[in-house]
């Protein structure tokens, strides 16, 4: 019954957000002056398909809307009859003289709640700091990093047309020793295209008293105007024994 209610809520909220997108579409896309564009809602719709060893294939549909400093998202994950979960979240970006601060909150069916606080300090060369916490209820982790964690890293925009960052996400609550190191390169050859490469390595235990596992992942994303496609392959996804392949195709509007 709870899953049925979640699906109905998803349909209602998705319809509301899609209506909002029509009412607040980017005026520049209709040939109107671009000066008003930053006051409009911008949306991103991302369907994803997950193939995981030992599990049924899964799908996820994520609709994210942003206006100025505000961002909202609504999503639903389903893995055959094994598990499904609806998520809704909010994020706010605070621009500061020395960088930006981003608090976020996410709620999900099965009683899950989580939040994070992330900071970027600096501009052409910057530091990354973050803290995440959840209520430890049932949740399929689509971030693929520890949720109850700290983030520490560095980044730079000094390379031509590039943004490069190196950061670590480390469990600091559940005594699992989970740690994921990311090296991310974003390259924009022109105003219409962008490549994103995310290479990561992990080590840690699924739970505190289990054997440690190690794995790595590679994600490649290509953006062209309003459309993007992402392909990822991960060993020992979410510190399990399974490997996973992910495919996403997205549309911005």
What do the predicted segments below correspond to?
Residues 198-203, 207-219:
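An anionic, turn-rich surface loop/hairpin at beta-sheet edges
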Residues 1-40, 240, 252-253:
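Cleavable N-terminal export/targeting peptides
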Residues 134-141, 146-161:
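Eukaryote-skewed repeat-based solenoidal scaffolds used as protein-protein interaction platforms
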Residues 31-46, 145, 166, 176, ...:
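Long terminal segments
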